[in-house]
């Protein structure tokens, strides 16, 4: 019988990490482990890390302390981007037993078994095992694409279609943490999606580091992938998680908004700055004019399409004028919400050398202003949806007697709780926006008849 019977997982960061954690958790379950919550005194903790910001690093350290407080005799395994970038730093954390780099995270069971053998061999000399075991290789040696998808954790599933990035933006460590851009073939990706179609999942979110780079300029590309996925029976919705504006072609936009049967009218597009001067310093592959054209193209086809935007404040050398340029650019854009990131210095990136360091209090103030703008944008978009008929996928989230879900164009809707509505796509009419900024709705059709 396996010495370690219960395993808990914690995922930091992006949807891609969630898809990989879910796949790794199934490896554990196939190996005889019971998956439990973090607080249920597991024998093994697996923490899948992010390293986009300094806060993500700090969160990992906090989780290790929390894990050892919950189960002092447990094994703590760290994997993910932080583990690839700074394995020695993690290994110095009290309580960490195993640190796995990018090439080894899907071999976690083998490394756990090896670690267990070492513990048994040195049980009379605990000092020999005080330092964590590191299994790590240079990211240049990471070439394989490992398919992943999430299942059982949420109403929707995250399907990994691409990994790595060749862009090397000056603020970003992801190419150092995940390696070169790579993917499976379209046929292999369709096979993975059909595994999800065989379950009760209604919505699949396509995820990766730079999904628009699918195919890396070869015979296959992201547009061809969307057309192939759209033909899969058994999945009601596909949603694109995030796509670079220079890779979001007009043919992708046209297909998703006019021809596709299953792709949601929702795009999340990273801008990062509305200042062309800052975009150049960031080594972004577009300028503000192209970004504005993409937004205009989407809205000209479907005014109800939801558009989310990533933006970074406090990039080195960002002046007040640069920030105001971003503010004014975003105010004039017909977008639905913003994801605002406060710039965080990252080791081995070029950004810190490109300009004067922006004081943290200035970064926070700029972030606050953009969050307020995002709230106004979202509220304005939601108001345009009142009276319209949409389809909502209700999720397993219950709070104070309400059930929540999202329309195809990503409006968050609430309705009085009914267990029968969970994981059902239901025709509704949006009736009002409440004080919490959520849409109330009228159920138009009995879900059992849909």
Language-model segments: which ranges?
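Hydrophobic, well-ordered secondary-structure elements that form the walls
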Residues: 269, 310, 330, 338, ...
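Proteins enriched for Cys/Gly/acidic motifs involved in redox and nucleic-acid/cofactor modification
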Residues: 1-213, 227, 251, 267, ...
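Short, solvent-exposed loop/turn segments at secondary-structure boundaries
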Residues: 56-58, 180-187, 215-220, 281-284, ...
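Contiguous mid-protein beta-loop-alpha structural module that forms a pocket-lining wall or clamp
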Residues: 318, 334-335
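Terminal RNA-binding accessory module
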Residues: 353-450
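A structural micro-motif
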Residues: 33-34, 74, 97, 235-236, ...
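Conserved SAM/AdoMet-binding glycine-rich loop
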Residues: 76-77, 85-86, 198-320
């Amino acid at each position: 019988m396996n010495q370690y019977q219960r395993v808990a997982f914690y995922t930091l960061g992006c949807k891609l990490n969630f898809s990989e954690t879910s796949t790794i958790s199934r490896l554990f379950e196939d190996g005889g482990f019971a998956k439990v919550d973090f607080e249920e005194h597991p024998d093994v903790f697996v923490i899948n890390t992010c390293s986009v910001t300094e806060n993500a690093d700090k969160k990992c350290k906090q989780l290790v302390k929390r894990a050892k407080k919950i189960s002092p005799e447990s094994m703590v395994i760290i994997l993910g981007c932080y583990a690839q970038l700074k394995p020695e730093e993690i290994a110095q954390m009290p309580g960490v037993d195993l640190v796995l780099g990018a090439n080894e995270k899907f071999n976690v069971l083998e490394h756990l078994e090896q670690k267990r053998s070492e513990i048994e061999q040195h049980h009379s000399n605990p000092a020999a095992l005080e330092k964590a075991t590191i299994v790590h290789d240079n990211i240049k040696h990471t070439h394989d694409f490992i398919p992943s998808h999430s299942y059982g954790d949420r109403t929707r599933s995250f399907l990994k279609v691409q990994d790595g990035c060749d862009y090397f933006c000056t603020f970003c460590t992801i190419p150092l943490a995940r390696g070169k851009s790579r993917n499976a073939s379209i046929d292999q990706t369709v096979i993975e999606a059909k595994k999800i179609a065989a379950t009760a999942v209604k919505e699949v979110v396509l995820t990766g580091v730079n999904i628009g780079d699918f195919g890396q300029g070869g015979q296959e590309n992201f547009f061809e992938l969307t057309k192939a996925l759209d033909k899969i029976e058994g999945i009601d919705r596909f949603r694109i998680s995030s796509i670079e504006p220079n890779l979001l072609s007009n043919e992708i936009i046209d297909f998703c908004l006019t021809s596709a049967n299953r792709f949601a009218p929702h795009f999340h597009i990273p801008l990062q700055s509305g200042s062309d001067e800052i975009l150049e310093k960031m080594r972004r592959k577009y300028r503000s004019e192209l970004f504005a054209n993409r937004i205009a193209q989407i809205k000209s086809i479907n005014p109800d399409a939801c558009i989310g935007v990533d933006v970074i404040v406090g990039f080195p050398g960002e002046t007040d004028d640069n920030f105001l340029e971003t503010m004014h650019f975003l105010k004039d854009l017909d977008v639905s919400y913003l994801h605002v990131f406060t710039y965080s210095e990252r080791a081995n990136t070029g950004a810190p050398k490109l300009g004067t360091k922006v004081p943290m209090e200035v970064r926070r103030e700029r972030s606050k202003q953009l969050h307020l703008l995002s709230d106004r944008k979202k509220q304005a978009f939601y108001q345009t949806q009142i009276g319209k008929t949409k389809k909502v996928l209700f999720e397993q989230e219950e709070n104070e007697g309400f059930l929540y879900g999202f329309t195809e164009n990503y409006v968050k809707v609430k309705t009085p709780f009914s267990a029968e509505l969970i994981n059902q796509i239901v025709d509704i009419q949006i009736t009002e926006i409440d004080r919490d900024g959520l849409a109330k709705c009228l159920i138009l059709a009995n879900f059992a008849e849909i």
